[in-house]
A protein has these predicted regions:
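Aromatic- and Gly/Pro-rich amphipathic surface segment
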Residues: 41-64
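Membrane-helix interface/capping segments
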Residues: 83-87
Length: 243
């Protein structure tokens, strides 16, 4: 229980940091002007082939697949499987946390890394570069590299798939198929919406797969080695471990 509390606190803090970087801190963190403005020829060619006339619709659909459908599949199926396979005497809520936290950790920590890259690189979004008429500058104009939607959905799909594999879940094929199907659809829609270039979503997808596979393993190994736990202390909580 103390270890679960520490993990939940850490992933919640990461989630809040991400939300802050997307809201109150975004103006201060994003580049005022693009640092990477001109796309390579292959990006421009793919963009011309895939961009939709109705970019707003593609953007809306990518948000639905990326922020609604993918989490429902990745976390929802994992939670349902955990609840239905709780051992006798085991806490159902504890089992759900144990199985869904690796997924949440992979997403939250990888998204912080994505934000750091986006703000540092300052790549101009294609919708800004190819706009027929210059629009009002915004804090979302120069965060094209690399795609956060793609990284998120592939991290969700991969980490959920790995949890299902670890438990020998009969739902594993469904988790992989639905998760990667939604992730691939989301990546395509980000290009169709003119929000990202093909290289943005390709690297975002690869990063998400790597994060979904590696982060839960690395974090679990670190915790086992150092015995990290969040324990009650006078006036609050303390982080205990062996180093």
């Amino acid at each position: 229980a103390p270890r679960r509390a520490w993990r939940l606190a850490a992933v919640s803090a990461a989630g809040l940091a991400y939300l802050a970087s997307e809201t109150v801190l975004k103006d201060a963190l994003t580049a005022d002007a693009c640092r990477w403005c001109r796309p390579p020829g292959i990006d421009e060619s793919i963009r011309d082939s895939l961009v939709w006339n109705d970019r707003a619709q593609a953007d809306t659909l990518s948000n639905l697949t990326g922020y609604v459908a993918a989490p429902i599949v990745g976390i929802g199926i994992t939670a349902i499987w955990a609840a239905s396979n709780t051992a006798s005497g085991e806490s159902t809520f504890g089992r759900i946390l144990d199985d869904t936290l690796p997924v949440a950790e992979a997403v939250a920590y990888s998204q912080l890394l994505v934000q750091a890259v986006k703000f540092s690189v300052g790549r101009q979004r294609p919708r800004v570069r190819f706009a027929q008429e210059p629009g009002q500058p915004g804090n979302d104009d120069n965060v094209s590299f690399f795609s956060g939607h793609s990284a998120l959905t592939f991290a969700l799909a991969t980490s959920a798939g790995m949890v299902a594999r670890r438990h020998g879940s009969r739902l594993e094929p469904m988790v992989w198929a639905l998760g990667y199907g939604l992730a691939g659809t989301t990546a395509f829609l980000r290009v169709a919406a003119d929000e990202h270039y093909a290289t943005d979503v390709a690297l975002g997808s690869a990063f998400g797969i790597a994060a979904g596979y590696l982060l839960p393993r690395l974090l679990d190994d670190f915790r086992r080695r150092h015995g990290l736990a969040l324990l009650p202390a006078s006036g609050g909580m303390t982080l205990a471990g062996a180093f």
